[in-house]
């Protein structure tokens, strides 16, 4: 049973996360030969203030995630 874990900065739409889950599931089926029903995907969302890039919290950045409604 493949288990795929993804960590993202919060702010993406439910539609974007559903599309990601579908795409990752299909990739596991295609590349690993895993039965679709055995693939698990976990998305963990992290607040931007808890995600640092180059020593700066991502919350300090001016642009939201590309698919964000913000």
From Swiss-Prot:
Keywords, alphabetical: Isomerase, Plasmid
Alphabetical list of PANTHER family matching this protein: 2-HYDROXYMUCONATE TAUTOMERASE, TAUTOMERASE-RELATED
Isomerase listed as a keyword: yes
Protein's UniProt name: Probable tautomerase RSp0893
Catalytic site: 2
Enzyme Commission number(s) from the entry: 5.3.2.-
Classification of source organism: Bacteria, Pseudomonadati, Pseudomonadota, Betaproteobacteria, Burkholderiales
Matching SUPFAM superfamilies: Tautomerase/MIF
Native source species: Ralstonia nicotianae (strain ATCC BAA-1114 / GMI1000) (Ralstonia solanacearum)
């Amino acid at each position: 049973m493949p288990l795929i874990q993804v960590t993202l900065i919060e702010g993406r739409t439910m539609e974007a996360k559903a599309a990601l889950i579908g795409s990752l599931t299909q990739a596991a089926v295609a590349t690993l030969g895993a039965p679709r029903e055995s693939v698990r995907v976990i998305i963990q969302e992290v607040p931007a203030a808890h995600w640092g890039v180059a020593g700066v919290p991502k919350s300090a950045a001016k642009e939201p995630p590309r698919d964000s409604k913000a």
